[in-house]
């Protein structure tokens, strides 16, 4: 069985139908709801039934996969629409990892959420077992019907966070289950690889209440004459919206009617024409937005050219562009410097923030294409422009940029570039001229500024305790080690050694504190070897 994350829509549905997983899942669901008088299944593990909630689960260790079945009592109609709001800062939120800067909170289906949290101890133990199973490369299927399927979905979301990227992800299969989250959760999951781990089997005669709760994952909608798989959540809503019967529905006959081949959406006569047209239009709009981004990327090259020209002009007057920009922010005098800040830098920041948002919004297969197309341009932008944002940040009297002030889009651009393992960037050829190099670590100047703040504390604080002084001095030594590492790797621009740079200001103060203690960096600086750094040999 392939990892569900590698499959889309109808492909996932076809795999599950032809593999017999639906019948296997449903038969085990029937067993947990109507247990036989005797069961000699050696691979069966049964949880103790929760007296307070009625939640139960069983583990079936089959030859080819492990199946976890959740069972829950029917929902009271009075509470079927209740929701629980979870915020990223809530201590009792078991899903803080789903929250983001754009979506700091979301709501869950209260009956399912209460059942899930009531069995936290048992489910934690189950998680440990399943992680070991996944490490053995045996697929894990998590399933349930009605409210049991809703709890299975919550459990799968919780389990997915702890699974290593190299392992197969579990597949969650639900049957006629209430939706578990609001529009915020839907938006969070459609941006995530987690979305491909859910297959919801629903009879076309079933009507699911969607006025507040919204669908995610893939839906296998079963008609009398066949079935279709749909990922488009708007189409799912149009086809299934209505009142939901919260009880357990027998899907045995539904599964028996399924053809062994999936109907393709384009050829299907089971879906109204207006729904199909809506799906096609939304797909077209996504592609149009995709194309516009590539066109805009070419426009951004003009602003990058201005910044590169600015960097070159600064170097001609023996000052790095970081320090020139910082000085002009404090004492603006040149119109060109002002334009760099207010027009070119701002335009580039807006564009790249939108790129990151678009990548995070897209399915993983599309996102990987987008990231590859934008990879090098985004990396050059980050290394060129983030130092200018850092200059603004510290001019406002702030500190610790890397941990408290860095924009999310810079973090993601750096992460994506690192994930690609670009061998070209691993090591600079010793014979190559580095005069135009952009420092690899775009937070370098933030590290310099923080070290200058530490030096100022050491020089100006009266009566400082010895332990505090030791901690601050250790920070300077750590920064020295960091600087020496990127120098030896040839990953830092020679501009840092210009006499008026903030780094040289740091060095002049640091060597007073360092005294006669020698190190690789002090020998490099004191003998002025830095003057030949980066020159072709």
UniProtKB/Swiss-Prot annotation:
The chain crosses the membrane at residues 140-160. One of its GO terms (biological process) is positive regulation of defense response to oomycetes. Residues 1-27 form the signal peptide. It is an enzyme of class 3 (hydrolase). SUPFAM superfamilies: alpha/beta-Hydrolases. Disruption phenotype: Delayed onset of leaf senescence (about 4 days later). Reduced resistance to both virulent and avirulent pathogens (Pseudomonas syringae pv. tomato and Hyaloperonospora parasitica). Disulfide bonds: none annotated. GO terms for molecular function: carboxylesterase activity; carboxylic ester hydrolase activity. It comes from the Eukaryota. Its main location: membrane. Gene3D superfamilies: alpha/beta hydrolase (3.40.50.1820). InterPro entries: AB_hydrolase_fold, EDS1_EP, Fungal_lipase-type, SAG101-like. It catalyses: a carboxylic ester + H2O = an alcohol + a carboxylate + H(+). Pfam families: EDS1_EP, Lipase_3. The keyword Methyltransferase does not apply. Keywords: Cytoplasm, Hydrolase, Lipid degradation, Lipid metabolism, Membrane, Nucleus, Plant defense, Signal, Transmembrane, Transmembrane helix. It is found in: Membrane; Nucleus; Cytoplasm. Induction: Specifically induced during senescence via a complex epigenetic processe involving histone methylation. Expressed in senescing leaves. The keyword Lyase does not apply. Its EC number is 3.1.1.1. It is a single-pass membrane protein. GO terms for cellular component: cytoplasm; EDS1 disease-resistance complex; membrane; nucleus. Part of a nuclear complex made of EDS1, PAD4 and SAG101, that can be redirected to the cytoplasm in the presence of an extranuclear form of EDS1. Interacts directly with EDS1. Acyl hydrolase that triggers the leaf senescence onset. Can use triolein as substrate to produce oleic acids. Involved in the EDS1-dependent intrinsic and indispensable resistance signaling pathway; together with PAD4, required for programmed cell death triggered by RPS4 in response to avirulent pathogens (e.g. P.syringae pv. tomato strain DC3000 and H.parasitica isolates CALA2 and EMWA1) and in restricting the growth of virulent pathogens (e.g. H.parasitica isolates NOCO2 and P.syringae pv. tomato strain DC3000 avrRps4). Contributes in reinforcing the immune response around hypersensitive response foci. Regulates the nuclear localization of EDS1. This is Senescence-associated carboxylesterase 101. It comes from Arabidopsis thaliana. The lineage of its organism: Eukaryota, Viridiplantae, Streptophyta, Embryophyta, Tracheophyta.
